């Protein structure tokens, strides 16, 4: 059964390649510096193809590999992938466990390619809430790619916008309480320094793979 599903998956990709051939790449001045992708709709895509949801998630991993290679080739500075949100914990536990197994497998299997292609892996979100084995592989990959100077591939894991706002607010308040920052000095840069994405370039392009708005 699994082999039939894998064959069907390969056939779908063969019919619809992820990236068209670019006759003339965009000039560097027009290339987005920071691209973010909300990775949703994988399960629905699989259902539309007559496959089970987990095959949709596997297809998503294949897409990540292609997108990462592409962004590296056209010299995008940062690629953020919103891979697992705080809302995703509400999914069936069997599906959640599969997603983390898939993430762990990705971190292990893609490590050599990330290193070879000068890609630096980073991560944002409440990472301590992830399974211990996933945290370990994530940290190992981050450590091994830390000195790479090419594409910054940032995985948003256990991420929620409200969590980020709360975390940033607490960080600013702690600086005020310790005397490192006065209330009058609270401005946009001070808040940006406390965001999960501190140090990353401003977002230029946001893509939601499910097509929702």
Predicted features by range, described:
Residues 1-213:
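Flexible, compositionally biased loop and terminal segments
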